[in-house]
Design a protein with these regions (language model features):
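The feature marks the mature, well-folded catalytic cores of soluble enzymes
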Residues: 1-163
Length: 163
């Protein structure tokens, strides 16, 4: 594990609390960056901007405000992960950054995403993602429309050892 942490500044993520979290959890390196939506406002949650899987990351670097922060984040991620860039439109309209890689009961990687995200990715992007395991697209339009989030907002990865 790299013990790196990435976060987008927003109403839900403040610099001081982020610094406390980094210290408490003993992260080796932290990246706090500013983002901007197509409406000019900060992106409300990091998991909308990016999804870090075991060997790949889906990220919308187009929404980064500061070029130096963008370069630092992409340089860091590219050392350990295959980077799959998404556009601002894919992030905002299709929830393409809001995906989650899990492991099956056979310890095989599965990338869970909504049908909206699946349909928003290009064939090339889906091909890249599928190199790292099966894709599972689920129909959750009500969650996306009413809740404003997608598949990653509904789950968390917990990789506990078997007892």
């Amino acid at each position: 594990n790299t013990k790196f942490v990435y976060a987008a500044k927003s109403e839900r993520c403040h610099s001081e609390q982020f610094a406390n979290f980094v210290q408490l959890r003993e992260y080796k390196k932290s990246f706090l960056f500013e983002t901007k939506s197509s409406k000019g406002k900060p992106i409300y949650h990091t998991n909308v901007v990016m999804s870090i899987a075991d060997k790949f990351v889906v990220i919308c670097s187009e929404c980064f405000v500061n070029e130096n922060e963008k370069k630092e984040v992409l340089d860091s991620l590219s050392k350990t992960h295959h980077i799959i860039e998404i556009t601002l439109e894919q992030m905002e309209k299709n929830f393409c950054g809001n995906i989650l890689q899990l492991k099956s009961n056979k310890n095989q990687p599965i990338t869970v995403m909504s049908e909206t995200a699946f349909e928003g990715f290009t064939e090339k992007q889906l091909s890249e993602i599928s190199q790292y395991g099966k894709i599972l697209a689920v129909k959750i339009p009500t969650i996306e429309k009413v809740g404003g989030g997608s598949s990653r907002c509904m789950m968390a990865e917990v990789f506990l050892p078997k007892i």
